[in-house]
């Protein structure tokens, strides 16, 4: 059975790159009818936090990336790492190294000055000397000195690294915790991981991990190293490109299906398809279709996709998402029926839930027009026309059709073009120059509030 895993370190939030790796691993497992494992690599005691663990779990849940096993935690498996390290020591495949940090720093400096690649020199590999007193050793792996570590990467193709290029990596730190390369190997082995899908910043780790797996007599999983994500400027994606946490996008009003769709297209494609569901992604997903070149992160494309998903979203769902924002702004909200109408009017005009909240503000409170709009639309000539319209609006039943007829009649009787009246009317009531159909807007704002705003704004007109 195919088994994939996502194994983040809880030292921050679930970011865009990590989310894409998780998505590809999840999609491949689902496509193959396999299992997807979540593993938390929390052995960096100084940087790992429970807050980060929760942020990862929240991000996965929001994106709908459900896992079949886990979350497993490395710190709960310490005895296993220690057990296997002891086994390798007994088999002569690992050794204790007592070199101090100062010694190793001095060695690296000598190598640097000599123009050599910094690497451990194996000074304790076959040493017979007495260990120094009071020094807790690390455990190092005896990397083979001959031959090659070879693997057929499912994205990059065949990769071969000469073993003499690799130094004897540390397996266990002096504090009894495993290093990344040792922990990940044992975890993948014990959990039966068949396919390791991860960022290509791990390519250099793979030959080391393969050598450890061979020493343990294990079956080597298949590897797929996904190219990194770049900013529009070609530099590695960072916060300055907008590469914030997944939950930041949620809080900014993006829908999870938009982010999933966008992440899937970052370095993977299915023909010319731009928009597809999570179910279609699973149906179409193929590691061979992952591009070998880095993908460029484009916030505008993500926003475009989000706009699409907002347009087709159920009004009830959008109301559920926008209501907490509106209540947080202390707005008094109308009943469900009118809220649905407001959302339906606006959802094709906005790109995020946050924008939906912003765009709906004038339905819940009077918004003062900008001075430039007053200057443009509040004219001496239009004032008597508006006074006439206000008197007529005060007498009608407050329905959209009736409002429309009164505006139309006023335009006709004063020999105006529709925008000549609709624009100042719109600005007076909403404070905006662009809104949905003005009759629909006025109906939802309500008769009393509309008339109040119109009369209030008349005072701002030149006499």
From Swiss-Prot:
This is Glutamate--tRNA ligase. Gene3D superfamilies: 1.10.10.350, HUPs. The keyword Nucleotide-binding applies. It comes from the Bacteria. SUPFAM superfamilies: An anticodon-binding domain of class I aminoacyl-tRNA synthetases (SSF48163), Nucleotidylyl transferase (SSF52374). PANTHER family: GLUTAMATE--TRNA LIGASE, GLUTAMATE--TRNA LIGASE, MITOCHONDRIAL-RELATED. It comes from Nitrosomonas eutropha (strain DSM 101675 / C91 / Nm57). Keywords: Aminoacyl-tRNA synthetase, ATP-binding, Cytoplasm, Ligase, Nucleotide-binding, Protein biosynthesis. Belongs to the class-I aminoacyl-tRNA synthetase family. Glutamate--tRNA ligase type 1 subfamily. A motif ('HIGH' region) lies at residues 8-18.
């Amino acid at each position: 059975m195919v088994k994939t895993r996502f194994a983040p370190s809880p030292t921050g939030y679930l970011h865009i790159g990590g989310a894409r790796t998780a998505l590809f691993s999840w999609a491949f497992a689902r496509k193959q009818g396999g299992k997807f494992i979540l593993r938390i690599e929390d052995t960096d005691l100084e940087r790992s936090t429970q807050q980060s663990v929760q942020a990862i779990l929240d991000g996965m849940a929001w994106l709908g990336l459900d896992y079949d096993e886990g979350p497993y935690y490395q710190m709960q498996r310490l005895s296993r790492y220690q057990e296997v390290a002891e086994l390798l020591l007994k088999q002569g495949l690992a050794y204790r190294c007592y070199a101090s940090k100062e010694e190793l720093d001095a060695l690296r400096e000598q190598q640097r000055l000599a123009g050599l690649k910094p690497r451990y020199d194996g000074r304790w590999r076959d040493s017979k000397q007495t260990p120094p007193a009071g020094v807790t050793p690390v455990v190092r792996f005896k990397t083979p000195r001959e031959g090659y570590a070879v693997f057929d990467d499912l994205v990059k193709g065949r990769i071969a690294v000469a073993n003499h290029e690799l130094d004897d990596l540390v397996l266990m730190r002096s504090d009894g915790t495993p290093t990344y390369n040792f922990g990940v190997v044992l975890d993948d082995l014990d959990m039966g991981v068949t396919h390791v899908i991860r960022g290509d910043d791990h390519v250099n780790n793979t030959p080391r991990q393969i050598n450890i797996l061979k020493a343990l007599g294990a079956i080597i999983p298949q590897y797929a190293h996904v190219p990194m994500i770049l900013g529009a400027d070609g530099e590695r994606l960072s916060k300055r490109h907008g590469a914030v946490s997944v939950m930041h996008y949620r809080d900014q009003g993006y829908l999870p299906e938009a982010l999933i769709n966008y992440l899937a297209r970052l370095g993977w494609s299915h023909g010319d398809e731009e928009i597809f569901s999570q179910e279609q992604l699973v149906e179409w997903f193929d590691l061979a279709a992952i591009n070998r070149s880095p993908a460029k992160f484009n916030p505008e494309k993500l926003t475009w996709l989000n706009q699409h998903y907002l347009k087709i979203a159920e009004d009830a769902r959008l109301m559920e998402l926008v209501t907490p924002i509106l209540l947080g702004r202390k707005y008094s909200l109308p009943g469900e029926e009118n809220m649905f109408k407001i959302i339906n009017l606006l959802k094709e005009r906005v790109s995020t839930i946050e924008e939906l909240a912003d765009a709906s503000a004038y339905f819940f409170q009077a918004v003062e027009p900008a001075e430039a709009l007053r200057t443009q639309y509040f004219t001496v000539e239009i004032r008597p026309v508006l006074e006439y319209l206000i008197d007529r609006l005060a007498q009608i039943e407050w329905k959209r059709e009736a409002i429309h007829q009164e505006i139309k009649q006023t335009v006709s009787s004063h020999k105006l073009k529709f925008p000549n009246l609709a624009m100042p009317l719109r600005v007076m009531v909403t404070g905006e120059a662009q809104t949905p159909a003005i009759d629909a807007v006025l109906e939802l704002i309500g008769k009393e509030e509309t008339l109040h705003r119109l009369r209030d704004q008349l005072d701002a007109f030149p006499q």
